[in-house]
Amino acid sequence: MLGEVIGGKVVKSSKPEIGILDIDFLENKKKDQLFSTFPDKIKSLQWHSYEVQDLENIKSVTLIASSPETKYQIFKFQEHAYGIQFHIEIKDTTVSDWGCVPEYKSALESQLGKGALAKFDNDAKINMSSMNKYSTILYDNFKKLV
């Protein structure tokens, strides 16, 4: 939503980005109050088939992180608003809870094959500790801003 409001477009991705995948931080993160303490690469939970595009020419947008499939994983608009594509707000039951939604399970299986939900859930649990650590860092950094 933020991407469209500031002049970009939300479009269907060339292929859905689903799974526990890498997020690569750019040099801009070093100057950012929320993300400066993050490592250069983190694992994240992705489950989307739309993405923000066309923010390149908006001078007040700073790209902070990308992935191989999605350029705008994290971007900042001016100094007050952030767009985050991946899911940082996860818990142990997120994948299994979302997998109960027939449309979500169908999208998952059409992308990753039958039985993908169990593997995705296991991958999430394996990476849960580090993903929750980054969520806590983000929250703590956010509290310092307000």
Predicted regions and their residues:
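Cysteine-nucleophile active-site neighborhood
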Residues: 1-29
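Amide-donor transfer/coupling interface in amidating biosynthetic enzymes
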Residues: 11, 25-146
